Every structure is written in structure tokens, then in C-alpha cells.
Amino acid sequence: MDRLVRFTFRHFLANPWFTKLLSTENVENARFLKLLPDIPALHSPLVGQIRTILERGHAAGVFRRDVDPIQLYISIAALGYFYVSNMATLSVIFEKDLSSVSMVQEREAQAVQMVIDYLKTKPA
């Protein structure tokens, strides 16, 4: 799970154009995405891998059982997407350079920890 969160975070960081593309496509109500064939099939293997990781973690007594792999993927993606897509404005608001190596590393570590802590937390 650590590697998945880091990979996703780093993907958004290394490809800032992707956040712009997603933002534009959402403004357009996924107009162009709807024209592409088999889009759901592209994410099925990823969701399956997440499901497998969750099952293994539960079997090992490490992860809680009630986590939906799609919801988890959305949360993981959100942690990277929001940071990258709002880096400029948040840097001004908080008077910190969120693009600096130290800030990026801190945010990535926090994203990983947030996901791991969520997966270990017993449901209410």
C-alpha cells in the first residue's frame, strides 16, 4: 500500500499536466472521456490489485475488512491530485513553497501515513 500511495502521489507530481487535464474534463462533464472505448476496463486491474492488497492485509490481521477498493483508490488519488492542482494557491495562502523538496517529501509521507492509519483503524 505504501508503494501505491507513493507511486500515485509521484505520478501527479511528475505530470502536472494530468491534473489540468482532469480538471478540464470534469468541467466538461467528462465529455471526451465518454467517447473513449473501455475506459472502465482500464481501471479494473488497478481496483483488483487494491482489492487483493486489502484482502492480504486483512488475512494478516493488519487491515480492517470493510474498505471498498474503489473508495480507497479515490482517496489515494485525491491526496496527490489536490496537492498538485492547488500547489500554487496554497503556497501563497500559507506562505510556504509547497513545491520545495522538503515540503513535497513531507506531504508524501503524510499521505502514506494517512492511508495506512485509515486501513488499520477499526470501523466505528
Annotate each PLM feature.
Residues M1-F7, F18-K20:
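Active-site-adjacent scaffolding segments
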Residues M1-L4, K34-P40, E55:
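Amphipathic alpha-helical linker/stalk segments
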Residues R6, T24-V27, D68, A77:
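Short amphipathic alpha-helical surface patches that mediate protein-protein
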Residues F7-R10, A14, S44-A60, S75-A124:
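C-terminal peripheral helix-coil segments that are non-catalytic and often amphipathic
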Residues A14-P37, M87-F94:
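Amphipathic alpha-helical segments used for helix-helix packing
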Residues P16, K20, I70-A77:
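Non-catalytic, well-ordered alpha-helical scaffold segments
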Residues L35-L42, A59-S75:
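All-alpha amphipathic helical-bundle segments outside canonical DNA-binding/catalytic cores
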